[in-house]
Amino acid sequence: MTPPEGKAAPSMSTVIRDENDKVFRLDSLQGRPVLVNFWATWCPPCVAELPALDNAAKQLGDDVTLLLISVDRGGRQKALPFLQDRGITRPLMGFDPKAALSREMGVRGLPTSFLLSADQRQSWAYVGPREWDSAPMIAEIRNLLRLAKASPVPSRQNSQDHLLV
């Protein structure tokens, strides 16, 4: 589910915890594009796409900030060692064990990802795993970031599995 056209994505001030167990809010990243990925350790498609997300973060560099948000009930204590054991270190990490942020953003299945423009508007949403580090996906993300800069509200439907709002 995506926010109505032209609206900021909800819940920018909902509090979650970061990898250092400090309070973290999405709006603290305002001014930078953010790729937000909701995932869980018990979700096989989520786990399968983690290395590709980590590689995509390396390829995109400073163009976009990757934020992985675990919805595991065990929170940081469960998800952080899981990520570290797999060598996933590049993205920012957030922990939403009560699923407050995921509910407010309309997450209905895992994995779910949102691309937020620098002004915190949702550019698109994906439900399901993706080949994040593939050349076509990296090119699509960069194109969407260009569109978001050029127009405050780009709008088109690209396919059935993701919307550009």
Predicted regions, residues:
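Compositionally biased, proline/threonine/alanine/serine-rich low-complexity intrinsically disordered stretches
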Residues: 1-7, 146-165
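Conserved hydrophobic packing residues within short motifs/helices of P-loop NTPase cores
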Residues: 34-36, 67-69, 114
